[in-house]
Amino acid sequence: MEVHEEQVSAPVTGDATAKYLLQYILSARGICHENALILALMRLETDASTLNTEWSIQQWVDKLNDYINAINVKLNLLGYKIIRINHGIGRNAVTLKAKQNFESFEDNTAIRAHNNDYAVLQSIVLPESNRFFVYVNLASTEETKLATRFNQNEIEFMKWAIEQFMISGETIVEGPALETSIIVKEVNRILVAATGDSNLAKWRKFSTFTVGSTNLFQFQELTATDIEDLLLRLCELKWFYRTQEGKFGIDLRCIAELEEYLTSMYNLNTCQNCHKLAIQGVRCGNESCREENEETGENSLSQIWHVDCFKHYITHVSKNCDRCGSSLITEGVYVI
């Protein structure tokens, strides 16, 4: 997808605001953090001299959602849609990462408003948010969705790579997880807050739906150079992501486009709380938590939660797994 720099030079209102918001999402390769869109909307309202400095942040969120809904009315006719998807690593972790990467996600963001010809500096405190807006193809099959951007060999590589990610995620590794993992840090913080025990022993099990580049270079239908170039492009398009350790996994755009395909094709169990696909978060560590699928006879993976869903579950529901009864305080698995 061609990338266009955002240019807003004239006052905009109504349909024009919706148009610019759509352009902004497309300029971000079709996936945009909620706070970035709130800031873009504020900028548009400022240029149109319609910025209401008295609005709460929730009113801005509501107005953004109204515009997205209006955009979707027209996009649906073309076979596209902007969907809302929450990142599995949680609000706190996403916000921390966003602050590190983009100046626009600072807690106190200056928005210049015009009131009676005077410039008024209004400080806006953006919320913690793990919500992203993703521009997706509503085509009926995964092949059709991918064919608009990738050739057949590239599509076959993506399907093969995704299978490798899923196989990797089935394996629970015994031993300490990476202390540098933002998921490990966030889960440990949640456990301490839930128990009040700052000396709580860290879990010694983890799993990961990621695979190293060396393994991915084993694909036979493309050269190593082609695979390297494709991986870079997939990361740019937010289909895959690359970890600090050089491993690759599926990113939000891939989940948004192919969630139904992934859950059915690979017999993945969804988050116990929100029932959406979860490939980062927390899994029950008790082996007896695995259930046998009545249709296939295969054992499913144990219960899994997104980070925020896990926090809600152990805080408001139970500190024990509802399937096997084991303690989630001591018998958990980091899914990183």
From Swiss-Prot:
Record-level Gene Ontology MF annotations: ubiquitin-protein transferase activity; zinc ion binding
Main location: nucleus
Keyword Ion transport: no
Cysteines joined through disulfide linkages: none
Annotated compartments: Nucleus
Pfam families in alphabetical order: SMC_Nse1, zf-RING-like
CDD domains hit by this protein: RING-CH-C4HC3_NSE1
Family the UniProt entry places it in: Belongs to the NSE1 family.
Role description: Acts in a DNA repair pathway for removal of UV-induced DNA damage that is distinct from classical nucleotide excision repair and in repair of ionizing radiation damage. Functions in homologous recombination repair of DNA double strand breaks and in recovery of stalled replication forks.
Protein name per Swiss-Prot or TrEMBL: Non-structural maintenance of chromosomes element 1
Originating organism: Saccharomyces cerevisiae (strain ATCC 204508 / S288c)
